[in-house]
C-alpha cells in the first residue's frame, strides 16, 4: 500500500515540477539576459569556471572554460574541461532568437556548438568534486569514491582519454579513510590543499614537495576536531593560515594551521539545527562568512563574534548543499540544493520594508530564484570574468549557464523596477 502511495506522490511531484518548469520557460525572456541549457552525456556533481577567458577577434562572443566531472552508471568516468561561448555585451540581440521549446535566450538562438567538451581525462569512479589550483589553474584536484584525492595537470594528458580506461593521476594524496566532498586550495600559499571526509577528519597536503619516486603524497597534517562527517572545508581568502570547516555534528569550526593542537579548533560554534553542508568566506570582507545547512537556511557569521549569528536566510524548501559569495559584489551570495532552486541573496536589502504581496514571495534580501532545474542542483559556480553569470549543474545531466536580467540587480532603473524579486 505504501508503495502505491509513494508512486502516486512521485507522479504528482513530477507533474508539479513539469508545470513549474513550463511557467519558468515561458518567463525566461523577462527574467534573464542569458540562458543556455545543455544536456551533458552524464550528470556532473561538480562545476567550476576556470579563470581564463579568450576574446576572438572580430567575433561577438568570448570563450570561457569550465571544470566538470562525470557520474556514470558503472561506465568509465572522466574529469572534463568544457568551453562555453558567451555573447559580448554588444552582441546583436534579437528577440526572435528566443527558443521557447528549450527556454533559451540571449541572442544566441540554439546553444548547439556553443558548449563543447575539450578535454576528457580518465578518472577512478565519479568525480565528487574538482577544483583548480589558483596559482596554476592547469593543476586540478579531485575527490573520488575512494579515500584518495587525485591531482591532475591537464596539460600532461591527451585531450582524448586512453581507451583502456586507466586513470593516471599526476599525484595521489593519502590520509583519509573514506570519501568526501570538501576540497579547497589555499589562495595565498601555493600547493596547499585541504580536503574534508566522511571519516570525520580534514587533511592538509603540501604538494610542492613532490616525491622523487612514485606519485603518493601523505597528508602533512590531519585535523580531528569534528565528531561526524565533515561536509566542507574552505581556506580564508586573506589569511593564509586560517580555514573553516563544517560537519554533520552541526558545527562550524575555525582552524589556524600555526596552532600545534590539531584536535582542537580556534573556534567551534553550534551553527545550525541540522547537518552543516557548506561554507564560503566573503572575498571582500575578511570577517564575514556564510554556512548552508540541512535545516534549509543559510547563516551569516562574523569571525569577531561567532557566538552571535548575524542573519539567517530563509526561503529554501529543502537541504542546502552549496553556498558561494559573488566574486564581484560584496553583498551578493547564492545558495542551492535539493529543492532544485538556486537563490541569489542581497545582504544590503535585509530589513527593507515590503508590501504584503512581496512578502509572500520571500524576504526582501531574496533577490532572485533560478527555477531552471527540474532535479537537485549538484554544484554551481559564479563566472569570475562576467559579472552575474552563473553555471549550475543538476542530477538529471542538465548544465545551465545563465545571467539574470540587469533590471533585477540594477536599482538605477528610472521606471522603478522595484519589484525585483522574481521567481524563475
From Swiss-Prot:
InterPro entries: G-protein_beta_WD-40_rep (IPR020472), Histone-bd_RBBP4-like_N (IPR022052), WD40/YVTN_repeat-like_dom_sf (IPR015943), WD40_repeat_CS (IPR019775), WD40_repeat_dom_sf (IPR036322), WD40_rpt (IPR001680), WD_repeat_RBAP46/RBAP48/MSI1 (IPR050459). GO terms for molecular function: histone binding. Pfam families: CAF1C_H4-bd (PF12265), WD40 (PF00400). WD repeats lie at residues 32-125, 126-175, 176-223, 225-270, 271-314, 315-371, 372-404. It is found in: Nucleus; Chromosome, Telomere. GO terms for biological process: chromatin remodeling; DNA repair; DNA replication; DNA replication-dependent chromatin assembly; fin regeneration; regulation of DNA-templated transcription. Keywords: Acetylation, Cell cycle, Chaperone, Chromatin regulator, Chromosome, DNA damage, DNA repair, DNA replication, Nucleus, Repeat, Repressor, Telomere, Transcription, Transcription regulation, WD repeat. GO terms for cellular component: CAF-1 complex; chromosome, telomeric region; ESC/E(Z) complex; nucleus; NuRD complex. Its main location: nucleus. The modification N-acetylalanine is found at residue 2. Binds directly to histone H4, probably via helix 1 of the histone fold, a region that is not accessible when histone H4 is in chromatin. Core histone-binding subunit that may target chromatin assembly factors, chromatin remodeling factors and histone deacetylases to their histone substrates in a manner that is regulated by nucleosomal DNA. Component of several complexes which regulate chromatin metabolism. Belongs to the WD repeat RBAP46/RBAP48/MSI1 family. This is Histone-binding protein RBBP4. It comes from Danio rerio. The lineage of its organism: Eukaryota, Metazoa, Chordata, Craniata, Vertebrata.
